[in-house]
């Protein structure tokens, strides 16, 4: 993917990713990378991430969520890429 191009990622993260600070970890990393969007816990125990920004920043964010905070145990990260829709302002944790 072309560096600097605005893209959107939709990701589903599974493993021990709830109750371990995963959403706040993701929010901090996204804000540091100047990525917009949101992250939330899902009822099936996974975490959902929707984010937009430069391709290189999103790639860095996806690398970070593969690791997660020390207390997390990430099993899978399923990612779908699409064109950015400029749909978000800032980055937040959804409840």
Curated annotation (Swiss-Prot):
The cross-references to PROSITE patterns, in alphabetical order and at most eight, read: ACYLPHOSPHATASE_1, ACYLPHOSPHATASE_2, ACYLPHOSPHATASE_3
Gene3D superfamilies per UniProt: 3.30.70.100
Keywords for the protein's UniProt record, in alphabetical order: Hydrolase
List the InterPro entries: Acylphosphatase, Acylphosphatase-like_dom, Acylphosphatase-like_dom_sf, Acylphosphatase_CS
> Its domain of life?
Bacteria
Q: Which gene encodes it?
A: acyP
**What terms describe the molecular function in GO for this protein?**
acylphosphatase activity
Q: Which family does it belong to?
A: Belongs to the acylphosphatase family.
The reaction(s) annotated as catalysed by this protein in its Swiss-Prot or TrEMBL entry are: an acyl phosphate + H2O = a carboxylate + phosphate + H(+)
Species annotation: Salinibacter ruber (strain DSM 13855 / M31)
Name of the protein this chain belongs to: Acylphosphatase
Provide the E.C. number(s) assigned to this enzyme: 3.6.1.7
Q: Which Pfam families match?
A: Acylphosphatase
Please indicate if the UniProt record lists Zinc-finger as a keyword.
Answer: no
Occurrences of domain Acylphosphatase-like (ranges): 8-95
Instruction: Give the active-site positions.
Output: 23, 41
